[in-house]
From Swiss-Prot:
Cytokine that acts as a ligand to CD40/TNFRSF5. Costimulates T-cell proliferation and cytokine production. Its cross-linking on T-cells generates a costimulatory signal which enhances the production of IL4 and IL10 in conjunction with the TCR/CD3 ligation and CD28 costimulation. Induces the activation of NF-kappa-B. Induces the activation of kinases MAPK8 and PAK2 in T-cells. Mediates B-cell proliferation in the absence of co-stimulus as well as IgE production in the presence of IL4. Involved in immunoglobulin class switching. This is CD40 ligand. Belongs to the tumor necrosis factor family. The gene is CD40LG. The chain crosses the membrane at residues 23-46. It is a single-pass type II membrane protein. It comes from the Eukaryota. GO terms for cellular component: cell surface; extracellular space; plasma membrane. The soluble form derives from the membrane form by proteolytic processing.
Length: 261
Protein backbone atom coordinates (compact mmCIF):
# COMPACT_ATOMS: atom_id res chain seq x y z
CA UNK A 1 0.00 0.00 0.00
CA UNK A 2 1.31 3.30 -0.94
CA UNK A 3 0.68 6.06 1.68
CA UNK A 4 0.57 9.57 0.44
CA UNK A 5 1.77 12.47 2.65
CA UNK A 6 0.53 15.95 1.99
CA UNK A 7 2.54 18.79 3.46
CA UNK A 8 0.39 21.22 5.48
CA UNK A 9 -0.04 24.65 4.00
CA UNK A 10 1.92 27.39 5.78
CA UNK A 11 0.05 29.51 8.29
CA UNK A 12 -0.74 33.01 7.24
CA UNK A 13 1.28 35.60 9.21
CA UNK A 14 -0.72 38.56 10.50
CA UNK A 15 0.58 41.73 9.01
CA UNK A 16 0.09 45.31 10.37
CA UNK A 17 -1.40 48.23 8.53
CA UNK A 18 0.52 49.32 5.53
CA UNK A 19 3.08 52.10 5.81
CA UNK A 20 0.93 54.45 3.76
CA UNK A 21 -1.84 54.22 6.39
CA UNK A 22 0.60 55.19 9.19
CA UNK A 23 1.79 58.19 7.22
CA UNK A 24 -1.78 59.26 6.59
CA UNK A 25 -2.72 59.07 10.28
CA UNK A 26 0.39 61.03 11.25
CA UNK A 27 -0.35 63.78 8.75
CA UNK A 28 -3.99 63.91 9.87
CA UNK A 29 -2.94 64.33 13.51
CA UNK A 30 -0.49 67.10 12.64
CA UNK A 31 -3.16 68.84 10.58
CA UNK A 32 -5.72 68.73 13.40
CA UNK A 33 -3.25 70.07 15.97
CA UNK A 34 -2.17 72.84 13.61
CA UNK A 35 -5.79 73.75 12.94
CA UNK A 36 -6.57 73.96 16.68
CA UNK A 37 -3.56 76.20 17.33
CA UNK A 38 -4.41 78.38 14.35
CA UNK A 39 -8.04 78.69 15.49
CA UNK A 40 -6.93 79.77 18.98
CA UNK A 41 -4.53 82.37 17.60
CA UNK A 42 -7.17 83.66 15.22
CA UNK A 43 -9.68 83.98 18.07
CA UNK A 44 -7.19 86.04 20.10
CA UNK A 45 -6.43 88.24 17.11
CA UNK A 46 -10.12 88.71 16.34
CA UNK A 47 -10.88 89.67 19.96
CA UNK A 48 -8.10 92.27 20.05
CA UNK A 49 -9.11 93.57 16.66
CA UNK A 50 -12.72 94.01 17.77
CA UNK A 51 -11.55 95.92 20.87
CA UNK A 52 -9.47 98.21 18.68
CA UNK A 53 -12.39 98.77 16.31
CA UNK A 54 -14.62 99.59 19.29
CA UNK A 55 -12.12 102.16 20.58
CA UNK A 56 -11.81 103.70 17.13
CA UNK A 57 -15.57 103.86 16.83
CA UNK A 58 -15.85 105.61 20.20
CA UNK A 59 -13.17 108.09 19.19
CA UNK A 60 -14.96 108.67 15.92
CA UNK A 61 -18.23 109.32 17.77
CA UNK A 62 -16.47 111.77 20.07
CA UNK A 63 -14.92 113.50 17.07
CA UNK A 64 -18.30 113.74 15.33
CA UNK A 65 -19.84 115.10 18.54
CA UNK A 66 -17.19 117.81 18.82
CA UNK A 67 -17.58 118.73 15.14
CA UNK A 68 -21.34 118.98 15.67
CA UNK A 69 -20.83 121.35 18.60
CA UNK A 70 -18.57 123.53 16.46
CA UNK A 71 -21.18 123.63 13.71
CA UNK A 72 -23.87 124.58 16.21
CA UNK A 73 -21.74 127.43 17.56
CA UNK A 74 -20.98 128.69 14.05
CA UNK A 75 -24.52 128.15 12.76
CA UNK A 76 -23.31 125.82 10.03
CA UNK A 77 -24.91 122.66 8.72
CA UNK A 78 -28.52 121.57 8.57
CA UNK A 79 -29.05 121.07 12.31
CA UNK A 80 -32.16 122.61 13.79
CA UNK A 81 -32.09 124.93 16.80
CA UNK A 82 -33.67 122.23 18.98
CA UNK A 83 -30.96 119.71 18.10
CA UNK A 84 -28.22 122.24 18.80
CA UNK A 85 -29.67 123.08 22.20
CA UNK A 86 -29.85 119.40 23.09
CA UNK A 87 -26.25 118.85 22.00
CA UNK A 88 -25.06 121.89 23.96
CA UNK A 89 -26.91 120.65 27.04
CA UNK A 90 -25.25 117.23 26.79
CA UNK A 91 -21.85 118.85 26.36
CA UNK A 92 -22.36 121.18 29.34
CA UNK A 93 -23.43 118.25 31.53
CA UNK A 94 -20.32 116.34 30.49
CA UNK A 95 -18.02 119.27 31.27
CA UNK A 96 -19.79 119.84 34.58
CA UNK A 97 -19.28 116.22 35.64
CA UNK A 98 -15.60 116.38 34.69
CA UNK A 99 -15.07 119.58 36.69
CA UNK A 100 -16.91 118.19 39.71
CA UNK A 101 -14.82 115.03 39.71
CA UNK A 102 -11.66 117.10 39.37
CA UNK A 103 -12.71 119.33 42.26
CA UNK A 104 -13.54 116.34 44.48
CA UNK A 105 -10.15 114.74 43.80
CA UNK A 106 -8.42 118.05 44.53
CA UNK A 107 -10.23 118.40 47.86
CA UNK A 108 -9.41 114.83 48.82
CA UNK A 109 -5.74 115.41 48.00
CA UNK A 110 -5.64 118.64 50.00
CA UNK A 111 -7.38 116.93 52.92
CA UNK A 112 -4.85 114.09 52.94
CA UNK A 113 -1.96 116.56 52.82
CA UNK A 114 -3.47 118.64 55.62
CA UNK A 115 -4.18 115.52 57.62
CA UNK A 116 -0.60 114.36 57.27
CA UNK A 117 0.78 117.74 58.37
CA UNK A 118 -1.65 118.20 61.25
CA UNK A 119 -0.24 117.81 64.77
CA UNK A 120 -1.96 115.12 66.86
CA UNK A 121 -4.11 116.49 69.67
CA UNK A 122 -2.59 115.75 73.08
CA UNK A 123 -4.82 116.18 76.13
CA UNK A 124 -5.51 114.51 79.46
CA UNK A 125 -7.92 114.97 82.36
CA UNK A 126 -8.11 112.75 85.46
CA UNK A 127 -9.90 112.85 88.82
CA UNK A 128 -8.49 112.03 92.23
CA UNK A 129 -8.32 108.56 93.74
CA UNK A 130 -9.68 108.20 97.29
CA UNK A 131 -6.78 105.91 98.24
CA UNK A 132 -4.34 108.85 98.04
CA UNK A 133 -5.15 110.10 101.55
CA UNK A 134 -1.86 108.79 102.94
CA UNK A 135 0.65 110.13 100.41
CA UNK A 136 1.54 113.73 99.70
CA UNK A 137 1.63 113.11 95.94
CA UNK A 138 -1.99 112.80 94.85
CA UNK A 139 -3.09 109.70 92.99
CA UNK A 140 -5.53 109.70 90.10
CA UNK A 141 -8.19 107.16 89.20
CA UNK A 142 -7.67 105.13 85.98
CA UNK A 143 -11.44 105.03 85.45
CA UNK A 144 -14.50 107.22 85.69
CA UNK A 145 -14.02 110.68 84.18
CA UNK A 146 -10.67 109.72 82.72
CA UNK A 147 -9.48 111.14 79.40
CA UNK A 148 -6.24 110.50 77.49
CA UNK A 149 -6.39 111.60 73.86
CA UNK A 150 -3.69 109.20 72.58
CA UNK A 151 -0.55 107.32 73.58
CA UNK A 152 1.51 110.53 73.52
CA UNK A 153 0.39 111.21 77.10
CA UNK A 154 0.22 108.51 79.80
CA UNK A 155 -0.65 108.21 83.47
CA UNK A 156 2.37 106.64 85.18
CA UNK A 157 2.05 104.87 88.54
CA UNK A 158 -1.34 106.53 88.96
CA UNK A 159 0.42 109.78 89.96
CA UNK A 160 2.18 111.49 87.05
CA UNK A 161 1.05 112.64 83.62
CA UNK A 162 3.99 111.96 81.29
CA UNK A 163 4.28 113.42 77.78
CA UNK A 164 6.18 111.93 74.85
CA UNK A 165 6.33 115.01 72.64
CA UNK A 166 8.11 118.28 73.32
CA UNK A 167 6.06 121.47 73.26
CA UNK A 168 4.12 124.07 75.18
CA UNK A 169 1.39 122.69 77.45
CA UNK A 170 -1.33 124.27 79.52
CA UNK A 171 -1.24 122.40 82.84
CA UNK A 172 -3.95 122.79 85.48
CA UNK A 173 -5.21 121.30 88.71
CA UNK A 174 -8.02 121.88 91.19
CA UNK A 175 -7.64 120.63 94.76
CA UNK A 176 -10.63 120.76 97.11
CA UNK A 177 -9.97 120.26 100.82
CA UNK A 178 -11.71 120.50 104.20
CA UNK A 179 -10.42 123.70 105.78
CA UNK A 180 -11.49 123.17 109.41
CA UNK A 181 -10.53 119.54 109.96
CA UNK A 182 -8.60 119.05 113.19
CA UNK A 183 -4.88 118.92 112.49
CA UNK A 184 -1.79 118.70 114.68
CA UNK A 185 -0.59 122.08 113.46
CA UNK A 186 -2.20 125.21 112.14
CA UNK A 187 0.10 125.38 109.11
CA UNK A 188 -1.70 126.44 105.93
CA UNK A 189 -2.80 123.84 103.41
CA UNK A 190 -0.44 124.05 100.40
CA UNK A 191 -0.93 122.52 96.95
CA UNK A 192 1.97 122.42 94.48
CA UNK A 193 2.12 121.64 90.77
CA UNK A 194 5.50 119.97 90.18
CA UNK A 195 7.63 118.97 87.20
CA UNK A 196 9.87 115.92 86.90
CA UNK A 197 12.40 116.25 84.07
CA UNK A 198 13.58 113.31 81.91
CA UNK A 199 16.82 113.29 83.94
CA UNK A 200 14.86 112.73 87.18
CA UNK A 201 15.21 116.16 88.80
CA UNK A 202 12.09 117.76 90.30
CA UNK A 203 11.01 121.36 90.72
CA UNK A 204 7.88 123.29 91.61
CA UNK A 205 6.02 125.05 88.80
CA UNK A 206 3.11 126.58 90.74
CA UNK A 207 2.11 126.71 94.40
CA UNK A 208 -0.88 128.01 96.35
CA UNK A 209 -1.80 128.05 100.06
CA UNK A 210 -4.96 128.46 102.07
CA UNK A 211 -5.46 128.91 105.79
CA UNK A 212 -7.66 126.71 107.95
CA UNK A 213 -11.13 127.75 109.04
CA UNK A 214 -12.68 127.31 112.49
CA UNK A 215 -16.23 126.96 111.21
CA UNK A 216 -18.14 123.72 111.64
CA UNK A 217 -19.21 121.53 109.96
CA UNK A 218 -16.37 121.05 107.46
CA UNK A 219 -15.98 124.04 105.16
CA UNK A 220 -14.66 122.99 101.79
CA UNK A 221 -12.36 125.26 99.85
CA UNK A 222 -10.68 124.85 96.47
CA UNK A 223 -7.26 125.79 95.16
CA UNK A 224 -6.85 126.37 91.42
CA UNK A 225 -3.47 126.22 89.71
CA UNK A 226 -2.80 126.60 86.00
CA UNK A 227 -0.18 127.87 83.59
CA UNK A 228 1.64 127.36 80.29
CA UNK A 229 4.98 125.55 80.41
CA UNK A 230 7.37 124.02 77.92
CA UNK A 231 7.82 120.30 78.51
CA UNK A 232 10.52 118.06 77.08
CA UNK A 233 9.80 114.60 75.72
CA UNK A 234 9.76 112.19 78.67
CA UNK A 235 8.92 114.87 81.26
CA UNK A 236 6.06 114.36 83.72
CA UNK A 237 3.99 116.54 86.05
CA UNK A 238 2.30 115.74 89.35
CA UNK A 239 0.44 117.41 92.25
CA UNK A 240 1.78 117.54 95.79
CA UNK A 241 -0.12 118.62 98.95
CA UNK A 242 1.01 119.18 102.53
CA UNK A 243 -1.85 117.23 104.16
CA UNK A 244 -3.46 114.58 101.89
CA UNK A 245 -5.98 113.62 104.60
CA UNK A 246 -7.81 116.93 104.07
CA UNK A 247 -8.32 116.43 100.32
CA UNK A 248 -11.90 115.88 99.14
CA UNK A 249 -12.22 113.10 96.57
CA UNK A 250 -15.85 113.48 95.53
CA UNK A 251 -16.77 113.69 91.86
CA UNK A 252 -15.51 116.95 90.39
CA UNK A 253 -13.79 118.14 93.57
CA UNK A 254 -10.16 117.34 92.76
CA UNK A 255 -8.86 117.01 89.20
CA UNK A 256 -5.70 117.31 87.13
CA UNK A 257 -4.97 117.67 83.42
CA UNK A 258 -3.00 119.17 80.57
CA UNK A 259 -3.43 120.27 76.96
CA UNK A 260 -0.78 120.70 74.27
CA UNK A 261 -1.01 124.10 72.60
Amino acid sequence: MIETYSQPSPRSVATGPPVSMKIFMYLLTVFLITQMIGSALFAVYLHRRLDKIEDERNLHEDFVFMKTIQRCNKGEGSLSLLNCEEIRSRFEDLVKDIMQNKEVKKKEKNFEMHKGDQEPQIAAHVISEASSKTTSVLQWAPKGYYTLSNNLVTLENGKQLAVKRQGFYYIYTQVTFCSNRETLSQAPFIASLCLKSPSGSERILLRAANTHSSSKPCGQQSIHLGGVFELQSGASVFVNVTDPSQVSHGTGFTSFGLLKL
